Amino acid sequence: KKARQGVKIRAMFDAFGNLSNNKPLRAKHIKLLLQHDIEIVQFDPMRFPYINHALSRDHQKIVVIDGKVGYTGGMNIANYYINGLPEIGAWRDMHVRIEGDAVNDLQRIFLYMWNSETKQNIGGDEFFPLSQPGVKTNGNKQVAIVNRIPKKQPKLLRHTYIEAINAAKRKIQLINPYFTPTHSVVKALEDALARGVRVEIMIPGKSDIPFTPDAAFYAANQLRKKGAFIYIYNGGFHHSKIMMIDERFCTVGSMNLNSRS
């Protein structure tokens, strides 16, 4: 509909992630989109040997509209977000809408990924409006975009989480669907518990990935023994990736608490 109205649409999806979708994009779907003048490309198409492509994927979820409105978080564009999955039920997630200067950061990330994959060189003022309307925030809140480009800066997001955990004085609240944290994240949480910080962790009781709940239960139980409070979400599958520190700082994004993310 928007393409028929003259809106230029560019879309990128991860080739490996698409294969794991319950209703993946097929060649016929891509052909139909291209026929409607929608540019759509795969990030890092799967080629032999496939193992070389399995780990460093594009897990970002970004939408930028007219360079003025951005969306990011944990949500994929998939059928199961509407209908759920028979084996796990309804799918729950968290996304945020952003307006103002922080949208420029999301735009830069998209353009970098797009130009790197397509070898195009798009950019310029049309993507970065010179003036953004003033956007009121509740209590002068600040927004920062922290990004890890696939195959680059592998520890950036991990360090961001650890620094936030280390800064906690009263409470840490985590929701993550695949809770198998690295040793460094576990140590940061254990150190927080040792200094009297309340740590609350919510993990889903069911998962779209086999054996993930078992691994998450084990990791969470180890922290429970150190004093953490563990909550199991049984209302379907909770795909959100959220961390709150002292009810003052919050992350909403696409990073899972596992070594791959």
Predicted regions and their residues:
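Charged, low-complexity intrinsically disordered terminal segments
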Residues: K1-S261
